[in-house]
A protein has these predicted regions:
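Short gly/pro/ser/thr-enriched loop/turn and capping motifs at secondary-structure boundaries
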Residues: 38-40, 63-64, 86, 110-113
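A generic local secondary-structure boundary/capping motif
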Residues: 19-20, 67-69, 91-94, 128-133
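Long, hydrophobic N-terminal alpha-helical segment
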Residues: 1-56
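Short coil/turn connectors at secondary-structure junctions
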Residues: 1-3, 25-28, 52-53, 73-76, ...
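Structural motif
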Residues: 33-35, 80-84, 146
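Short low-complexity, flexible loop/linker segments enriched in glycine and/or proline
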Residues: 45-48, 71-72, 157-159
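Glycine-rich, aromatic-bearing surface loops/beta-hairpins
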Residues: 93, 101-163
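Ordered, amphipathic secondary-structure segments that act as subunit-interaction surfaces
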Residues: 58-106
Length: 163
């Protein structure tokens, strides 16, 4: 298995990602996909320092080019994007299939135009559309900051966005 865990988290790599989730879903490394972070040496260095594991920070296009190598690897990776829109690009538009069909949504901070779903979990209409598209592609979506702290799945919240 090349990907052991799929997560959307606006902080991408931090203590919650690397410690409690790694106990639930063992991993050897992390793949963070975000165009802005991948183009910033400072952000890349910060994410790599925070993980304590082999860490890659790629653009969405980089991931597309390297997806088969990820699938062929014996290394178990967490696949993390900063937002649902990037995850939709990978799972739906690129059609990346790794055998994992559950997407965990972690912290998504309050922003202008976002709807609060729970503590530190808010999404915009555009992000909701991305989650709906991911769901329709056959993925279950759970909102969970930590393994033992879940506020529910996408079906519980999608009505707030007209789905």
């Amino acid at each position: 298995m090349s990907v052991s865990f799929i997560r959307i988290d606006d902080r991408m790599i931090h203590g919650q990602t690397c410690t409690p989730w790694a106990r639930e879903y063992p991993c050897d490394g992390l793949i963070a996909v975000n165009d802005k972070a991948a183009k910033s040496d400072v952000l890349k260095a910060a994410y790599k320092a925070a993980s304590g594991k082999k860490t890659f920070v790629w653009t969405v296009e980089d991931f597309k080019k390297k997806a088969q190598k990820v699938l062929d690897s014996d290394t178990r990776y967490f696949l993390i994007t900063k937002d649902p829109i990037d995850m939709r690009k990978i799972l739906v538009e690129q059609g990346f299939k790794c055998g994992i069909t559950k997407v965990i949504v972690g912290p998504c901070n309050d922003r202008e135009g976002s709807t609060t779903l729970g503590n530190n979990q808010s999404i915009t209409q555009e992000e909701a559309q991305a989650l709906e598209d991911i769901s329709k592609a056959g993925y279950s979506i759970e909102f969970s900051l930590l393994p033992d702290v879940s506020i529910g799945n996408w079906d519980k919240f999608k009505g707030k966005f007209g789905f």
